[in-house]
Amino acid sequence: MTAPITIIGSGHAGITLARELRRLSPELPIRVLTRDDGHYYYKPDLSKAFAAGKDAEGLIKSTAEQLREQLKIELRCRTTVTRIEPAAHRIWVGDQALDYSKLVLATGATPIRLPLSGSAADAVLTVNDREDYARFRAALPDKARVLILGAGLIGCEFANDLAAHGHAVQVADLAGWPLPRLLPEAQGRALQTALSGLGVQWHLGTGLASLDREGGAITAQLANGQRVVVDVVLSAVGLRAATALASEAGLTTRLGVVVDDRLQTSAADVYALGDCVEIGGRLLPYILPIANAVKALAPTLLGTPTKARFPAMPVIVKTPACPTLVNPPPAVEGGWEVTGTAPDLEAVFKDASGRPVGFALTGKATAKRADYVPLMPAIHEPAA
């Protein structure tokens, strides 16, 4: 009996691949292993659940049992893969060995955790999956006071969603303005002003010194001397590609699991997909590249090697208070050129040669997306 194609991870990447494989091959044996409950949901919905009027259960699009029936797959939930043996085409779940024909790592990314001190350091929550979100919602009282650590994409999206629905939100970040890695200062300030209009308070240019429990609340001591009293602390300081399993198996890892143009790792018949991937020296930490990757990887797994191409894919930041669209520039020397009047701003990032390699649009300027996308280089162009 042929060993199944095995996918580690049941997030958007893993399930999208399983769907495409099943579409292309109705009888193919497919096994999916996941550490969580296996229910499928759309991860970007986590940071706009209040706006959608949904709790954690309401975010489920397909239950694990429905996935098994719809896709005719073996889906093992609450299952942790502890070891990969690429040479043997085998993985281990504790002391149980499972053979595979081809293996796909769709392990995603894990939250970066700040080293914190104080009696409430262990009370900090992160939201990286639906079960995390359930714990976060359970911790929120009505009209909660929430401190968000991090003014990046996830921090700003949660700030918008929470503040727009009656919660008192404060955001702390070492940076001088929101989305500092994605926006020039003028646009970051426009976003800051819009979120301030919802009641969001900002503590920028400062870090967190300690967190302590006082009564039923948490007191955050900021590095600038300010004290903030809140009910809940949410850490949104970023994600790190989940590479441990691959690294322990001897696969090449750097920022992520290193893959070639066909998404194969340094080991034969082992591939990677989604947030854990590094291709051409870059991570692909957003949802849109997954569709392109799957369209290449599925036929590759079925015997038709196909290279993945990733064109420019602007990211929609879910901050309705200030609509924002970003095509992040690569890590190259250059600078932003900004035009317009806040909040309706257009920004182009040009490299040292003057070539446009990124853009950002805020407010009404987001309507000009189609003007900018054709000017952008691909995120990754496979070798000829």
Feature-to-residue mapping (PLM):
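Conserved beta-strand-loop-beta-strand element in the redox core of flavoprotein oxidoreductases
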Residues: 84-98, 212-227
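Beta1-alpha1 glycine-rich phosphate/pyrophosphate-binding loop at the start
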Residues: 2-73, 161-182
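Mid-to-C-terminal Rossmann-like scaffold of FAD/NAD(P)H-dependent oxidoreductases
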Residues: 2-3, 10, 276-370
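Rossmann-like dinucleotide-binding cores of NAD(P)H-dependent redox enzymes
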Residues: 60, 154-210, 290, 308-324
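FAD-site-proximal beta/loop scaffold in flavoenzymes
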Residues: 120-143, 219-221, 227-299
